[in-house]
Each structure stands twice: as C-alpha cells, then as structure tokens.
UniProtKB/Swiss-Prot annotation:
Keywords in alphabetical order: Cytoplasm, RNA-binding
Gene this chain is encoded by: smpB
InterPro entries for the chain: SmpB, SsrA-bd_prot, SsrA-bd_prot_CS
GO molecular function: RNA binding
Domain of life (superkingdom): Bacteria
Gene Ontology process terms (BP): trans-translation
Record localization: Cytoplasm
Residue runs in coiled coils: none
Source organism per UniProt: Prochlorococcus marinus (strain MIT 9515)
Function per UniProt: Required for rescue of stalled ribosomes mediated by trans-translation. Binds to transfer-messenger RNA (tmRNA), required for stable association of tmRNA with ribosomes. tmRNA and SmpB together mimic tRNA shape, replacing the anticodon stem-loop with SmpB. tmRNA is encoded by the ssrA gene; the 2 termini fold to resemble tRNA(Ala) and it encodes a 'tag peptide', a short internal open reading frame. During trans-translation Ala-aminoacylated tmRNA acts like a tRNA, entering the A-site of stalled ribosomes, displacing the stalled mRNA.
Family matches, as NCBIfam families: PRK05422.1 (NF003843), smpB (TIGR00086)
The name this protein goes by in its record: SsrA-binding protein
Similarity annotation: Belongs to the SmpB family.
GO CC field: cytosol
Length: 165
C-alpha cells in the first residue's frame, strides 16, 4: 500500500523562531539619536559563536565601516573561548563582515556619506539557531542634548511615582 504525501505544509509542525538577546549596547542609546534599525547577519568563526552564546561579547566601542563594497563590524570585543587552545582561538578584536543585501549596503553608505550619520551595533541575539546583529543608523548627541534627555527621564520618573500614590 502506498501512502500519499501532501505538499502542503502543516503549520502546527513548524517551530517559531525564538529570540534570545545575548548582549545589548545601552551606551549607544545614550550617545546617539537612532533614526533607523536594521537586522544583519554576521560572519563568525566557530570559537566566536561559542563565546557569543556564553555572553562574552562587548558592543560598547563598536562601529561599522565600508570597505570594498562590504560593511564591516569593527572594534567589537568577543572574548576567546576558554576551552580551546590559543592556537585555534580567534583574535578578539578582528574585523567581522556583516551579511546584508547589496541594496541595503548601498542605502546605508549613501545615508552615512550624505547626512553624516554613524552605524552602531545595538544588540546581538539568537534568532532560532542564527546569531543576528541589530545595527542602528544615528547621529551623535551633543552634551546639551544628553543633559536634556536626562532631565526628561527624571521628570517622567517623578510623574510615574506621583501617579502611583
């Protein structure tokens, strides 16, 4: 007897992508006024993947730059994996290629050149089994802008406490 197999996919069998945030750049939200965010993949080595999954990554000083039609993630520290010898381990501050479509790269490049914007890594997370990076396009805040943002946060906090009473 031959069983018929239908080509229709069963929605109940599909697994939903699970998001697990591994690191976040809180400093970027204070330093920059972020106008747009984009999800990008990262080209990583095996020991880097293990280290990121353990949460040993620092995005604070990171930024993105263009080279030969590609976008690179610079100055992001991914600690060497502990259980691997030094010969097989990676360089913690090496340049990592971001995986984006050509149109997205062109759009980012034109925005940064014309408007004087910066591309900053905001967070790194797991999407299913893939490691993804959220990059933000933003402009650096001046000192008075930072002070004004702090004052507004304090005012909102005072209003919330007053309403709770």
């Amino acid at each position: 007897m031959i069983a018929k197999v239908s080509n229709k996919s069963n929605k109940s069998n599909k697994k939903e992508a699970v998001f697990k945030r591994l690191a976040e750049n809180r400093y970027a939200k204070f330093q920059y006024e972020i106008s747009e965010t984009i999800e990008a993949g990262i080209e990583l080595l095996g020991t880097e993947v293990k280290s990121i999954r353990n949460g040993n990554v620092n995005l604070r000083d990171g930024y993105c730059s263009f080279r030969d039609g590609e976008i690179l993630l610079l100055n992001v520290h991914i600690s060497p994996h502990k259980n691997v010898g030094s010969f097989f381990n990676h360089d913690p501050l090496r340049n990592r290629k971001l995986l984006l479509h050509k149109k997205e790269i062109f759009k980012l490049k034109s925005n940064t050149e014309k408007k004087g914007l910066t591309i900053i890594p905001l967070s790194i997370y797991l999407k299913g089994s893939w490691i993804k990076l959220t990059i933000g396009i933003g402009k650096g805040k001046k000192l008075h802008d930072k002070r004004q943002a702090d004052k507004q946060k304090d005012i909102k906090r005072e209003i919330k406490t007053a309403l709770k009473r």
